[in-house]
């Protein structure tokens, strides 16, 4: 696969290969930078692989690389210096009488214009090109676009071997075409297993010029014994015929374009024999063009290994004025191999998109257009319409002429992508002006429209948020109502239990209420009003913003019940422990009642049980009242949130009751200690009961244990240290 990729890229184009660099034969020269671009543009169009200018230095050194970052393809092009250095580096430059950097075909063109005035019947006048960009002279050039005049007898055609008659018929047609252009194709000996192809270009002979008609009649039979042109060999080319046909097609394509321009005819005129022309040389040239087109259609088919695309790029429409830097230029280093197959390259549409910026810059002078629009529109390009420019600028015409596209190829998607490239180019221009501080951003009409649109969007958002906030508010309010109803029912039950506990419990509850008032004032931390909208003015707060504030406050109120304080958690644990103790006492009570029918024992146990139960009920009553009071404080808090002056009052109360709150925590710890003492009493009672069960045959021990338990319940100071939990000792 790698071998196929290497050959496919290296030998697809007769110039872009290893032999392009300076070597033993002196390499190839390009008179201008535009001549090099003609070659590289054709190469990248055939391969659909964009070649980018990676670096340049003072218009002397240029680095070209593949558009893929990891691809090793690279060409280094450098300025070759003056004419003296050029003569020493090229063996064929000794006979070159043209000034440095001036193509040979331009010199011939100037001489031929004088001959055209003298002899209008010369059929070779149609071969003169009017576009000097198409042709360039290189030393030892295999694939070139030279237009030499057939009357110039200095152009001698040479052959390495005298076996011209041994070529097949297909090669004969191609050789005839090249001989008319001053170029011939040579083959090595037939004994080689791999044929070698080379193309020599005729040079000026020292002998004097002869008549043009003699040169035209005996053009194909002249042979020069002196070999003054060195050739390039391609040892890896599989088939000479494929390379020859590809080169013949390229030259024929350029010739047909040049003749059409010169005669003022369309491209299709070359496919018809001009029967009305009295000049036989013109007929001969037209027939040659027909043969070239036929050979080209065969050579560029999809099955031919020497060509990739069915169409060649039209170099006539290139505007290389900016690239026409005088040379000569030579390739100092080349790495023609790619690391990716041709199938992975770009499609024609994507390839064209990569060329849009350069066409805008060089061909359409888009920078000048933007600058003109910028100056005429008060330092802005807002009036510049990209869609109108795509249709009216002639960009599509350039793409159709250069890359062989038709109007049907420009689909809507491709046009939008082209417009996007132009928009990107325009955006870079605007960014450059903004960095310079020259761009005018003030656009009242557009800004007012944007403000109106933003207001509409905000109003729609507010409407949606209002509906959502209202639904959430309804859910939260309903949930709060149901929870408050349940709490009120529980509080009513607890109040009825409190009435049965006596005056002592009422005093304790009153004390607990005062404590809870201080606790709620300490626990309440007034929040700042949230910033509703940092872009809104104070008088532009919407209804949704107010509803969000209410929603946050309601959520905060609900979180108080969801996340109780540490004192409430401790009280809940103590309540659960007391309930377990009561259940155990009841079970022990039933077991004792079944075994002992003594009324005295039952009465004593009932006294203990009632005392414990009353203590637990009083604790539950205190906790329920605390919960009820906390609910009341939550309601008051919601009201306080709406009144800032009451919030300030709460802050003052908080600072004044700080010390009382600290005392409150100490009192809560004492209450927890009392509960733990009750649990100790229960554990002592359990031990005595177990002892009684083990010695049920001795009832007098039970009476003593019960009496001792009653005495300990009445007087807690008589408890020994062993029966007190370690954390409560010494208190």
Curated annotation (Swiss-Prot):
Processing and modification events after translation: Extensively phosphorylated on Ser and Thr residues.
Residue spans crossing the bilayer: none
Subcellular location: Nucleus
Domain writeup: Contains 2 important clusters of amino acid residues in the C terminus (C-terminal sequence 1 or CS1, residues 624 to 628; and CS2, residues 639 to 662). CS1 specifically participates in transcriptional silencing and/or repression in a context-dependent manner, whereas CS2 is universally required for all functions of ABF1.
Protein name, UniProt field: ARS-binding factor 1
UniProt source species: Saccharomyces cerevisiae (strain ATCC 204508 / S288c) (Baker's yeast)
Molecular functions (GO terms): DNA replication origin binding; DNA-binding transcription activator activity, RNA polymerase II-specific; RNA polymerase II cis-regulatory region sequence-specific DNA binding; sequence-specific DNA binding; sequence-specific DNA binding, bending
Compositionally biased region (Basic residues): 689-698
Location of the region described as C-terminal sequence 1 in the Swiss-Prot/TrEMBL record: 624-628
Keyword DNA-binding: yes
Predominant subcellular localization, coarse grouping: nucleus
């Amino acid at each position: 696969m790698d071998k196929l990729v290497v050959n496919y890229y290296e030998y697809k184009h007769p110039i872009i290969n290893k032999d392009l660099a300076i070597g033993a034969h002196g390499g190839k020269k390009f008179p201008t930078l535009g001549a090099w671009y003609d070659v590289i543009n054709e190469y990248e169009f055939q391969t659909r692989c964009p070649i980018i200018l990676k670096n340049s230095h003072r218009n002397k050194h240029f680095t070209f690389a593949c558009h893929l970052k990891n691809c090793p393809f690279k060409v280094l092009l450098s300025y070759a210096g003056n004419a003296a250095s050029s003569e020493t580096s090229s063996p064929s430059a000794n006979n070159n009488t043209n000034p440095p950097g001036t193509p040979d075909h331009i010199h011939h063109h100037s001489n031929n214009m004088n001959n055209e005035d003298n002899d209008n019947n010369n059929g070779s006048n149609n071969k003169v090109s009017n576009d000097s960009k198409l042709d360039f002279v290189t030393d030892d050039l295999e694939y070139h676009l030279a237009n030499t005049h057939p009357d110039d007898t200095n152009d001698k055609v040479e052959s390495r071997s005298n076996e011209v008659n041994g070529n097949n018929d297909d090669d004969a047609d191609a050789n005839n075409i090249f001989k008319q252009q001053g170029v011939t194709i040579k083959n090595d000996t037939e004994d080689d297993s791999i044929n070698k192809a080379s193309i020599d270009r005729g040079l000026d002979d020292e002998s004097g010029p002869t008549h043009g008609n003699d040169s035209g009649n005996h053009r194909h039979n002249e042979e020069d014994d002196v070999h003054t042109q060195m050739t390039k060999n391609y040892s890896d080319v599989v088939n000479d015929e494929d390379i020859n046909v590809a080169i013949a097609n390229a030259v024929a394509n350029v010739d047909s374009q040049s003749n059409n321009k010169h005669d003022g005819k369309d491209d299709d005129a070359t496919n018809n024999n001009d029967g009305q022309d009295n000049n036989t040389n013109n007929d001969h040239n037209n027939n040659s063009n027909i043969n070239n087109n036929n050979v080209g259609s065969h050579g560029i088919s999809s099955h031919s290994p020497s060509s990739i695309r069915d169409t060649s790029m039209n170099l006539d429409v290139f505007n290389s004025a900016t690239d026409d830097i005088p040379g000569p230029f030579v390739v100092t280093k080349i790495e023609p191999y790619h690391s990716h197959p041709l199938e992975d390259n770009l499609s024609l549409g994507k390839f064209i998109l990569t060329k849009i910026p350069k066409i805008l810059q060089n061909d359409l002078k888009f920078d000048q257009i933007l600058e003109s629009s910028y100056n005429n529109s008060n330092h802005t390009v807002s009036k510049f319409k990209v869609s109108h420019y795509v249709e009216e600028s002639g960009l599509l015409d350039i793409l159709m002429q250069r890359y062989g596209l038709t109007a049907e190829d420009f689909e809507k998607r491709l046009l939008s992508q082209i417009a996007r490239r132009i928009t990107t180019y325009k955006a870079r221009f605007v960014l450059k002006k903004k960095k310079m501080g020259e761009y005018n951003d003030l656009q009242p009409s557009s800004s007012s429209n944007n403000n109106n649109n933003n207001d509409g969007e905000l109003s729609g958002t507010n409407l949606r948020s209002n509906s959502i906030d209202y639904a959430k508010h309804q859910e939260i309010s309903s949930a709060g109502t149901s929870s408050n109803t349940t709490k009120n029912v529980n509080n009513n039950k607890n109040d009825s239990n409190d009435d049965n506990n006596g005056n002592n419990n009422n005093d304790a509850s009153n004390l607990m209420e005062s404590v809870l008032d201080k606790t709620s004032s300490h626990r309440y931390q007034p929040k700042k009003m949230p910033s509703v909208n940092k872009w809104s003015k104070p008088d532009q707060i919407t209804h949704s913003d107010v509803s969000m504030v209410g929603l946050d406050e309601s959520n905060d109120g609900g979180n108080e019940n969801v996340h109780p304080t540490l004192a409430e958690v401790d009280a809940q644990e103590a309540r659960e422990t007391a309930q377990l103790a009561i259940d155990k006492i009841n079970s022990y009570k039933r077991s004792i009642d079944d075994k002992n029918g003594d009324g005295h024992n039952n009465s004593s146990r009932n006294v203990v049980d009632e005392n414990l139960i009353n203590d637990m009920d009083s604790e539950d009553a205190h906790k329920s009242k605390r919960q009820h009071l906390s609910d009341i404080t939550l309601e008051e808090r919601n009201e306080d949130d709406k009144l800032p002056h009451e919030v300030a009052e709460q802050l003052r109360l908080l600072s004044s009751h700080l010390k009382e709150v600290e005392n409150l925590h100490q009192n809560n710890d004492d209450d927890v200690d009392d509960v733990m003492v009750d649990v100790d009493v229960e554990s002592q009672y359990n031990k005595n009961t177990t002892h009684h069960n083990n010695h049920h045959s001795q009832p007098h021990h039970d009476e003593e244990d019960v009496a001792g338990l009653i005495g300990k319940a009445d007087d807690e100071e008589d408890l020994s240290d062993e029966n007190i939990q370690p954390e409560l000792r010494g208190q």
